[in-house]
Curated annotation (Swiss-Prot):
InterPro entries the record matches: Phosphoglycerate_kinase, Phosphoglycerate_kinase_CS, Phosphoglycerate_kinase_N, Phosphoglycerate_kinase_sf
Gene3D superfamilies named among the record's database cross-references: Phosphoglycerate kinase, N-terminal domain
Species of origin: Streptococcus equi subsp. equi (strain 4047)
Class of the enzyme per the UniProt entry, highest EC level: transferase
Pfam families assigned: PGK (PF00162)
HAMAP family (alphabetical): Phosphoglyc_kinase
GO molecular function: ADP binding; ATP binding; phosphoglycerate kinase activity
Gene Ontology process terms (BP): gluconeogenesis; glycolytic process
Biological or metabolic pathway of the protein: Carbohydrate degradation; glycolysis; pyruvate from D-glyceraldehyde 3-phosphate: step 2/5
The EC number(s) this enzyme carries: 2.7.2.3
Keywords per UniProt: ATP-binding, Cytoplasm, Glycolysis, Kinase, Nucleotide-binding, Transferase
PROSITE patterns named in the record: PGLYCERATE_KINASE (PS00111)
Protein name (record): Phosphoglycerate kinase
Amino acids binding substrate: 21-23, 36, 59-62, 119, 157
Length: 398
């Protein structure tokens, strides 16, 4: 990666501004999954072990008005991080002002301070999300010309806390997480060891058009599963019953199939039910067609076998999007089958592109078997599309 990284800097005695991604799920003030906090530890530890004074910025959820602040404070995150680091995390509870500035000025080498949720600045004119120049300049002024971006999850957005700070410091560099994310995903797509197989699931073709187009050029095979299967089916005149279908994307699906040169691999059967939630009957379709009054909610056993065969010998696999409604035990076999088919390939570099696929791997006990699980759904999708990420573009060149 031709950008400066945290290892290229002298950090001792410096106030180091760090954008992390602590956008973790909270239920009644309790963090239900702290993976993103753990993912930021290597960079934070490196800074404090090298005598830097770490000043951390993160958003949490969406905040549009005063009422949205309820339950969106980073206070529980500060507590969790302090436990993980084994030291105090100073939390003034504000995004600007005299109290925050005094706390930063009082920092000693090796100490950590967490600024309050950056999106609290969105209440007045979306200053964070719209990259307000004054806010970026103010936050940059809290440090000493050094900014470390370690938030891959927001790298596809130009916000005041990433692009805004970057524009107002002498050196904007990548943290270890950002560096790894880019290395794994970009290298997999740009210079993969072959055979390179991409697997795309999820419900909407519209979310994945750019990704499918880019990967059809780069991958040896692109396997399609999940709800978007049925838009591809209908585009070919296959009966889909009550299955999910994007009627306005039938032409796109048809054109993708036509230009795929056989690289696009679709399921050959489905697990169908007579309703999404309160169903009374679940069965496997005979072939591709879904029965009248039923909807496809997972790929079927023949499809799992077909995908297993398509993955045989693969050296690079990128997977984004589950094969079915994996949260329901009745419709998780497809996702499990595909995960198992990926991880059993000898010497495979296996990458999960964040979002629901990451949740599936974690919830279904397969996370430790993958080479890399991305922390950013939207950002990894844009990398897979071949787009440049604003948060990355704003970093200083080596």
């Amino acid at each position: 990666m031709a950008k400066l990284t945290v290892k290229d800097l002298d950090l001792k005695g410096k106030k180091v501004l760090v954008r992390v991604d602590f956008n973790v799920p909270l239920k009644n003030g309790v963090i239900t999954n702290d993976n993103r906090i753990s993912a930021a530890l290597p960079t934070i530890k490196y800074i404090i072990e090298h005598g830097g004074r770490a000043i951390l910025f993160s958003h949490l959820g969406r905040v549009k008005e005063e009422a949205d602040k309820e339950g969106k404070s980073l206070a529980p995150v500060a507590k969790n991080l302090a436990e993980k680091l084994g030291q105090e995390v100073i939390f003034p509870g504000s995004t600007r002002g005299a109290e925050l500035e005094a706390a930063i000025d009082a920092l000693e080498d090796g100490q950590v301070l967490l600024v309050e949720n950056t999106r609290f600045e969105d209440i007045d004119g979306k200053k964070e999300s719209k990259n307000d120049p004054e806010l970026g300049k103010y936050w940059a002024s809290l440090g000493e010309g050094i900014f470390v971006n370690d938030a891959f999850g927001t790298a596809h957005r130009a916000h005041a806390s990433n692009v805004g700070i970057s524009a107002n410091v002498e050196k904007a560099v990548a943290g270890f997480l950002l560096e790894n994310e880019i290395a794994y995903i970009k290298e997999a797509v740009e210079t993969p060891e072959r055979p390179f197989v991409a697997i795309l699931g999820g419900s909407k073709v519209s979310d994945k058009i750019g990704v499918i187009e880019n990967l059809l050029e780069k991958a040896d095979k692109v396997l399609i599963g999940g709800g978007m299967t049925y838009t591809f089916y209908k585009a070919q005149g296959i009966e889909i019953g009550n299955s999910l279908c994007e009627e306005d994307k039938l032409d796109v699906a048809k054109s993708l199939l036509e230009k795929s040169n056989g690289k696009l691999v679709l399921p050959v059967d489905s697990k169908e039910a007579n309703a999404f939630a309160d169903y009374t009957e679940v069965k496997v379709t005979e072939g591709e067609a879904v029965d009248t009054g039923f909807l496809g909610l997972d790929i079927g056993p023949k499809s799992i076998a077909k995908f297993d065969e398509a993955l045989t010998g693969a050296k690079t696999v990128v997977w984004n999007g589950p094969m079915g409604v994996f949260e329901n035990p009745d419709f998780q076999e497809g996702t499990i089958g595909v995960m198992d088919a990926i991880v059993k390939q000898p010497g495979v570099k296996s990458i999960i592109g964040g979002g629901d696929s990451a949740a599936a791997a974690i919830n279904l006990g397969r996370a430790d078997k993958f080479s890399w699980i991305s922390t950013g759904g939207g950002a990894s999708m844009e990398l897979l599309e071949g787009k440049e990420l604003p948060g990355l573009a704003a970093l200083t060149e080596k």
